[in-house]
Each structure stands twice: as structure tokens, then as C-alpha cells.
């Protein structure tokens, strides 16, 4: 993947000084706020279509990834799908026979519902499907119930990453959340539930990796010693 990225940049006429992997960048963004130094972190990168769990150790200016686990077919889209199917079930309709346009409406409303819940106690879905006015109201507790199967799929990579790193959760100094799905309070609460450790919440999941990459570039520009090990 790194070789392909370098080749793509070269073909585009972009000079690549160095690549920094995403977990290391997230750890740097965290350290920029909390202080540079030694530490061991769990990086939960939960985007629209993939989940990656990384255990990153920072020691003597070296960022080393101790273990990686994940699910390449799990992301925010799975929450959308679960909400969409629940909407149809509660309104007594079958999702599968719906026209592509109607399906698109239901999925769009499901995503809007998911996005709005972090900032308000309840979210409502209203759609005109097949000439009928359909509606559904969700709160965060119901969202957890509706998406329980999705949440359970999150637990396995978390446990595998810890197992492969030969560390326990007590060895983890902090849990860093990145990716749009980590903005959901229900995701943060579930990570805390399965680890027993409250994740860091003062890092922006949407921009943490970009910030970390910028910090890495700044450190390299000053010729400071920093190594990034895969």
C-alpha cells in the first residue's frame, strides 16, 4: 500500500519525502495536545467502511506499531443499514422490493438520523414511500439496540489487537478515537464498555490524522529525531 501510494504520487509529479502511517499520525496529534513523551495508545480508526484497531508505542522518539486488527467491511455504512432496515420493519414494509430511489431516500434519512443524534436527544425520520407517509423516532438507547450486531463486531478487533500486542488494557495509557463513526456517543460509550477505559474525547476524530501528519512534517523540517516504524 505504501509502495502504491508513493508510485501514485510520483506519477502525479508529487515528491514524497516520507510517508507516515495513520496510527502514528493520530498518536502525534494526541501528544501535541497532551505532551510529547513515552506512552502506549490504542488507536480506534472507525470510518465509513472500515474499522482498524492499532496498538502504538511511543518510546524515545520512536513510534512503533505493536499490533493491528480490524474489519475491512465494517463502518458507518453498517449503522446506516441497520437503521434503514429498522425503519422499514417498524413501518411494516420490506426494504428489498423498494425502488432504487426509495432505498436511497431511506438510507439518506438513516444517515442523517445517525449524524444528528450526537447533538440532540432524539432524531426523527419522515419519508413518503409508495405514496405513504412513514416515520420513526430514535434516541441513543434505541440506536444501541437497533445496531447491537454492529457494535458486537467492533469488540472482536479490539480484543485481538490487545491479544496480539501481548498487552492488557491496563498497559494502555489512552484510547484515541479517529474517523467519523467515532463521533457517535454510542460508539465512544461502547469502546469504554468493552475496555473499561474512557477514551480521549478532546481530539477531533475528523482531523486527528491530518493534524498528526502536519506535526510529523514540522518535526522533520526542524530535523528533530523521530522515527516511524511499521
Residue ranges and their predicted role:
Residues 1-230:
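Oxyanion-binding/catalytic loops of NTP- or PPi-dependent enzymes
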Amino acid at each position: 500500500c505504501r509502495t502504491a501510494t508513493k508510485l501514485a504520487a510520483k506519477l502525479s509529479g508529487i515528491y514524497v519525502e516520507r510517508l507516515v502511517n495513520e496510527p502514528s499520525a493520530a498518536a502525534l496529534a494526541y501528544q501535541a495536545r497532551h505532551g510529547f513523551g513515552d506512552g502506549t495508545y490504542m488507536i480506534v480508526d472507525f470510518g465509513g467502511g472500515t474499522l482498524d484497531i492499532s496498538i502504538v508505542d511511543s518510546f524515545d522518539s520512536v513510534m512503533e506499531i505493536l499490533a493491528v486488527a480490524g474489519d475491512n467491511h465494517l463502518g458507518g455504512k453498517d449503522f446506516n443499514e441497520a437503521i434503514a432496515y429498522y425503519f422499514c420493519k417498524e413501518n411494516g414494509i420490506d426494504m428489498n422490493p423498494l425502488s432504487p430511489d426509495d432505498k436511497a431516500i431511506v438510507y439518506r434519512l438513516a444517515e442523517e438520523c445517525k449524524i444528528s443524534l450526537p447533538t440532540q436527544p432524539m432524531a426523527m425520520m419522515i419519508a413518503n414511500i409508495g405514496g405513504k407517509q412513514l416515520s420513526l423516532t430514535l434516541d441513543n438507547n434505541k440506536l444501541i439496540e437497533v445496531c447491537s450486531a454492529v457494535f458486537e463486531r467492533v469488540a472482536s478487533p479490539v480484543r485481538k489487537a490487545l491479544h496480539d500486542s501481548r498487552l492488557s488494557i491496563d498497559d494502555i495509557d489512552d484510547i484515541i478515537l479517529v474517523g467519523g463513526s467515532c463521533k457517535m456517543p454510542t460508539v465512544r460509550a461502547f469502546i469504554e464498555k468493552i475496555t473499561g477505559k474512557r477514551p480521549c474525547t478532546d481530539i477531533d476524530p475528523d482531523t486527528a490524522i491530518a493534524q498528526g501528519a502536519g506535526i510529523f512534517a514540522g518535526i522533520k523540517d526542524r530535523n528533530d529525531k523521530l522515527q516511524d516504524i511499521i
